[in-house]
Amino acid sequence: ANGDWPGSNMKLWRERVAGSKWRWMIYDLDFTFGGNAQGLATTNTLAQATATNGPDWPNPPWSTLMLRKLLDNPDFKNEFIQRFAAHVNTTFEPNHVLAVIDSMAGNIASEIPRHKERWPQSISFGNSWQELVDIMRNFAIDRPANARGHFYSKFGISGSSSLVIS
């Protein structure tokens, strides 16, 4: 969940040559993973990204137009829902995300004292480094169920089924 999106922190571009494809990039994700009150595990970013009349920040109508129009296409809508389901059950499965967080935190933990000394305002929540990592860990645990609920509500899905391939 990024509470500072989709009206900011994204860029769209393409080369000005025949046949070039549009590119999309999101950046500046410090409002994600529970790092800000607008980026909590319960934040309904699907509603933000599809609102027709959002406020100037974070989701003015121009910033949601592309996804709204794409979702008007039944094939795209189905693929969007299917990809979400695949990713929420694999890429964003809590144990997988926790392993990534723990690995990354372990890789940089020894640098945190030097970082705090050099940039004392960069970790400004008043929490310890480990408390900030724990906020991310809790987000990783709580987010999938919330995001599923947002998809179920938006698209009128009554539930899910499990498929095991041996």
Model-derived segments and spans:
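Middle-to-C-terminal accessory/interaction subdomains
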Residues: 1-165
